[in-house]
Structure formats: structure tokens, C-alpha cells
Amino acid sequence: MTVKLVLASKSPFRSALLKNAGIEFSTASADIDERAVEAPLYESGATPEDVAQILAEAKAIDVSEKNPGAVVIGCDQTLSLGDEIFHKPHDMEAARRQLQKISGKTHQLNSAVVLARDGKTLWRHVSIAHMTMRDLDAGFIGRYIGRVGDIALSSVGAYQVEGPGIQLFEKIDGDYFTIVGLPLLPLLAELRREKCIDG
């Protein structure tokens, strides 16, 4: 029996990772207000890892309730610098401010992936990467944002390491798939255990 897989994301990057791994799936967007889910979590002292996991779980459960019998993959990623959490920048000025704030420091990417079926969580996982950014001057940041354009608005931190964003870093500790927002190896192992893919 083949299990239907659904990715609860319209992210072209996450879709490409699964397609490149030879996984057959469909996509569906979750109907949740991420900021409304996050707010009480931060007030109660949740860690950035907790927030990523809870958001991934909310997405997976929402989509699984609309796709009976399917195994749904929910994902989320948070960027934290100390106690501060960053979101995708809403405009180029916000992207510039984010880069200035994380320049010369080590921030953390927390990537969560959750599997759900029929409104119930089957499995959850969080991977962490530590990203040390070079000291960037304002001129370089401006040129970088000018070169990458709207790509700066599509990722938390205003960068993508799979493109020119890699030039922003002096050191990276963590799995590539964690950095791009989908901890693929643990996910594939769990999909095999759940008999969703051949293994």
C-alpha cells in the first residue's frame, strides 16, 4: 500500500530537496497565523527550538486534517541570536537591519520537521546549525542586498547559503539540510520507518 505524502509548505526550496531525493509528494499550505501561534510561546519562555517545532507541528496537523490518511510533513525554521528571534524581513530596509545585527556574530538556525496523520503527530525532530557571520560593513551589505534582490526577503536572516549568501559567513557548524530548512536525513529515516518510502 502506498501512503500519500503531503508537504505542508509552498517553499520551492523544500520541494526541490524532496524532489531531488526522489520522493513523490504533493504540497498544500497550512492555514495558520504563525505570529498568533508564536506570541504566547515567547511570553511563556519557549526556546527558539520549541517555537520551530510547535509551528512545524501546527502546519502538519492543519494540513493532515484536510488530507485524511495522508502523512503530512510540516517544517519551520527560526533564527535566534541570544534571546532574540528573527523573522523573514518584510522589506529591504528590514533585511539590511537584520544583516547589520547578525554581522560578526554567531547565530543559531533551528530547523524543525514533523510528521502528522489525521490530526495526530507521528514524529517530531529539531536540528540546529551555528552560523558565524563575517564582519560586514554597511557598503558590502548594501551591495549584497542590491545583488540578491527579493531573495533577501524569502529567508529568515536575509540570506540563502546555496547562493551568494554563502559569502557572508566565516564558519558554519551544522548539516546543510538543517541550514536550508529541512532536516532531510532524519526525515528520510522516519519515512522509511513509517513505510512511506522504500527502504
Swiss-Prot record:
The active site is at 76 (proton acceptor). It is found in: Cytoplasm. It comes from the Bacteria. It comes from Brucella abortus (strain 2308). This is 7-methyl-GTP pyrophosphatase. Nucleoside triphosphate pyrophosphatase that hydrolyzes 7-methyl-GTP (m(7)GTP). May have a dual role in cell division arrest and in preventing the incorporation of modified nucleotides into cellular nucleic acids. One of its GO terms (biological process) is nucleotide metabolic process. Keywords: Cytoplasm, Hydrolase, Nucleotide metabolism. Its EC number is 3.6.1.-. It catalyses: N(7)-methyl-GTP + H2O = N(7)-methyl-GMP + diphosphate + H(+). PANTHER family: BIFUNCTIONAL DTTP/UTP PYROPHOSPHATASE/METHYLTRANSFERASE PROTEIN-RELATED, BIFUNCTIONAL DTTP_UTP PYROPHOSPHATASE_METHYLTRANSFERASE PROTEIN-RELATED. Its cofactor is a divalent metal cation. GO terms for molecular function: nucleoside triphosphate diphosphatase activity. The record marks 13, 77, 162 as: Important for substrate specificity. It holds the Pfam family Maf. Belongs to the Maf family. YceF subfamily. The keyword Hydrolase applies. One of its GO terms (cellular component) is cytoplasm. Gene3D superfamilies: 3.90.950.10.
